């Protein structure tokens, strides 16, 4: 019976797939196909291609068992947050659509032209809207309330009211110089093997790594001035301001080839080619590499927005807010922020690990059980090959122990501050406590970075030249993180990573029970912290051991160039090659272009180059590979330069990093020194605080260096925590005038409120938790008679009743819950990674050759009958205005004598599931994939 049921389902699905496309094509031939329909058809096919590739990726991830390969771990670390994923998918559909239109138009006209030359602006707007891109190109609506001026939005939007998208999450990285693409729009540098730069091809990035960058783990020069914590802070802060998601699919859109299995350049695959003599024994010819997702409205899509005659080359998206706002702690989207908060606490706390403690102190929580398990498993559990990763404001918190340590430290600091602020202000709501603690933590991130970290990287002279003292908010300064900063300049820190993870005992000596680990032994390994003595041994190692010094002939060690993200012996990755390839993927201009941008002289000859790079052997190797100084990749050129005095970068990176930091500071309306953000008393207290004080307050350490970034010897260079100054939170105590008649406001179930002032009056702004909607007045004002209205109510939203934007995919059943919903799958299906789509669990019975044969016979007969009917209807049918075979995907075509019908994809029905795609609004389905049932 089970086999019969499977056969029946197979036949019904086959008939449906065959019948409806033929009927649809018959109607088109009868009445003609309007231009809008042709555009819609291309969009449907593009959605199918993108979603099929994404679906194949999801299925592969679901079925994979065992330890993840380095490439899979890299993909996991670059996995976009759901909101970013929606935007990336929309951009990929947009780009695929335009490429298909290009092929159609060029085939019809027999000449190369852009599809925007052949389509009306109305149709271009339809393409932009139907792809889902258009909403992300429009400026957000900025609330004009007292609350909007008190706390920064989690997305960073509306920081600048004249330019509300500046610095916001999920917007394009800024360009300080135009990109260099081989086709002028999108193709990376090095995409076409025959493309020449100054008469020479670019060298393969792996060759550059092997001959210029890589050194043995044993060849490490220690920094005699700075601790390993300086390196860790740089990486942590980089993750606060920049994250460029990779393509949402790990398979090529044109045919579904797995990017981990192909060595051809097929978007989004841009593999790193390996020289024959350096290939592993298995004979792998390349290392997998995925292109960064394009920002909506750029590259081939660019002509659809703004001036149609102006090219808008491919840009890359920053999934985080650009601002120094502690998004590493709180996230950059409302959805992630909700996940991170403890909603049962009246103290505005963040969630912590429910079971494990570090001598009574909190650990980060694990990701939800439904999320992909990509980290190393707990030791000693038989049969386990993967385990959960930590949940934090940035998804890379589990990459290396030093990052995990800082994420854990700031989680504890938030909860410490929140509890103390609640004790001072018992009348504050949970949301008010949370927002005030978040505000303080964000200010501390800004202070430690600009006061303590950046001057040591740039040196005092360059810091004064490029950053200088704070002179107030500048509404003309664009704080958006630049592409060259994120992709090249701030990656200088990779050359300061030590190959060993050092863990020290209470006397700051090598721990007898916790020996040092090679870095590759600690990648994505939460249990290095949880079962490795907790946070204290790692913090001691970061404080008391030196960073690796960036030396011109010792740039990066083997842990990063040969063993990156290695949890098994299956394969490897190379961070240096990834950095070089990423710069080419993003179209970054060459080294000399950036020197000219910074007012530095161009280096045209070997003698010129030797003035910037003291090591003659390194300079010679670089020129031998690149042939011309203009061809040098900017990351390598900046990395190899001589240090400025008392700095840890050369002149080019000092310029680029300094310009970026000044923009982040001066262009931030919520910068801690701006007069409206804190009171004078609060600013004075914040200035007293330091990273050493944060360590004292949140670990078991009792002695620390006065300056956490300065390496020193224990005990002579360490101070008692009692002598490390910190802020006094009394400056945050809130009092009300004696004549106040409003008193403390009433609490609202499943909601919250915060105080602010408007025109000298106390104001309450209410909000409901996710999954609830507010009924009543959102804002109450204190008058002489009391509050002007009764508090509102928060009512549960039935998300499952939203027919226009269902929360679950059509393959799943939606069940409403209090404050949320559940997507349920019938056995033997299970939820995919998105939590909304049902996919094959691998337990489905497989269709036999008999059922397949019967299905084929039925399809053939049924299709033939339908074809005959349609051809008779359309004996005098109209001719299609656009040619067929636009996708190259082998779509079958129906031919009736001399007439040709526009072919339909066999997956048309599945593509129709995606027609009502989310425009990116909160709560909509973020992964509308082809049906699995």
Curated annotation (Swiss-Prot):
This is Thyroid peroxidase. The gene is TPO. SMART domains: CCP (SM00032), EGF (SM00181), EGF_CA (SM00179). Binds 1 Ca(2+) ion per heterodimer. It comes from Homo sapiens. It is found in: Membrane. The record marks 396 as: Transition state stabilizer. It comes from the Eukaryota. It is an enzyme of class 1 (oxidoreductase).
